[in-house]
Amino acid sequence: MGITETAAPILSNPLDPAQQQMGSPGIPWGNDVRIANELGAPLSTGHEGEIQVQGPNVMKGYFKNETATQESFTTDNWYRTGDLGWMNDDGYFFVTGRRKELIIKGGENISPREIDDVLYSHPAVLEAAAVAVPDAHYGQEIAACVVTKPGESVTVDELQAFCVVRLGDYKSPAKIQLLEELPKGPSGKIQRLQLVQHFAPINPTTMSS
């Protein structure tokens, strides 16, 4: 795992397959990596937070953009990747999503990938992506877009009931749209934030009053 701002990988799995852990981009590679909360305080193993990196391969800042530079570094000079994740007891990191894609419902942080994983487990679902939409009561509510497998069919009600059993009411999508395809970038990654346009705000009458 690497990003432009580090000019090199920050996490990598060992070459020995026996030391690799499935689903993890690996352990720190030539730098220091930590998980931190919203205030920049380090979190212990097993706790989800932002992946932050520090080391000689990290950029000094964005060219002629001091504002972006200040926003991207903590006061103790850790670069904020914007990726969310956690570290296990063996020191391996796991990525769970992006900070800007986090759903904040009623003050609770909900990773959209948690909803994605449940939807992907449905036998009729080919692709799925959860997003945050404005809500008058909670601030943000959960919505999701789904593409079904060829030859398969499923209703919105069936998908919502499937989620409620596995996630409970609070974390289940209030709205689901069935689409023919999901928008993707050049690398094939789903452009999650583009999906928001498919949903009107929840409780729009209340929100405008």
Which residue ranges define each predicted feature?
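AMP-binding/adenylate-forming catalytic core of the ANL superfamily
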Residues: 33, 39, 55, 60-61, ...
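Conserved ATP-binding loop and adjacent catalytic segment of the adenylate-forming AMP-binding
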Residues: 1-32, 44-49, 58-60, 74-76, ...
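A short acidic/small-residue loop/turn micro-motif
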Residues: 26, 50, 101, 197-200
